[in-house]
Amino acid sequence: MIAIPAIDLREGACVQLVGGSYAAEKVRVEEPLEALKQWRRHGFRAFHVVDLDAALGKGSNADAIFQLTAYERGLTFSVGGGVRDSDRVETVLSGGAEFVVVGTRAIEDAGWLADIANRFPGRVVVAADVKGREVVTRGWTAGSHRDIREVLAAFEPLPLGGLLVTAVHKEGQLSGVDLPLMREVASTSRHRLYASGGVTTMEDLRALAAAGAYGAVIGMALYTGRLDASAVAREFAG
């Protein structure tokens, strides 16, 4: 399993939110490139970038994203947040990202998801953000009334690059991962699982690896120093 630092962008800065609430910003790094450089010094090579403003339809951090993806050859970026049309998918993938992460429209429009997945096989990652068992959309602000297992079943035939499953109720809480949820996804789906939400300790990472996760996205625990970044990178940087 690989550990993947999160770089969440808001108003041009790198931030961390508690519980998926845009009113609960706990960490802010004014220059996202400095965050990337910090994680590179520890040895990380894969990064998950989210444009929080675009996710809410309130702007874009496209310039900051390009700075990140252009920084160094050989790094792997997954980029998401507000990717709701095919032109944006193409822009992200041609701009240096290995994977594009699609959430809201992928959940709401199966035909569109099938189209982009087949146009870009292995490069589309679907974000399934989960509160309890319900998949939520629109920057975690809207419910879909669909259970995670129902949503997973719809993705099985598609040539996806993976599933990014975020336990929103654990996000930024430093309270541990939702291991039953991640075990269920790993055992139910044939796609690579990228687990997110609540990673706090090395034991959390080892448990996710044992559960079958391909990758773990880590945010708050790295930014606050709760996790030793060097130790994580030594064991899980890939």
From Swiss-Prot:
Alphabetical GO biological process terms: L-histidine biosynthetic process; L-tryptophan biosynthetic process
Keyword Coiled coil (UniProt): no
Pathway: Amino-acid biosynthesis; L-histidine biosynthesis; L-histidine from 5-phospho-alpha-D-ribose 1-diphosphate: step 4/9
Catalytic activity from the UniProt record: 1-(5-phospho-beta-D-ribosyl)-5-[(5-phospho-beta-D-ribosylamino)methylideneamino]imidazole-4-carboxamide = 5-[(5-phospho-1-deoxy-D-ribulos-1-ylimino)methylamino]-1-(5-phospho-beta-D-ribosyl)imidazole-4-carboxamide
Pfam family, one: His_biosynth
Subcellular localization(s) per the UniProt record: Cytoplasm
Assigned EC number: 5.3.1.16
Top-level taxon in the UniProt lineage: Bacteria
Family: Belongs to the HisA/HisF family.
Name of the molecule in the record: 1-(5-phosphoribosyl)-5-[(5-phosphoribosylamino)methylideneamino] imidazole-4-carboxamide isomerase
Species of origin: Myxococcus xanthus (strain DK1622)
Gene, per the UniProt record: hisA
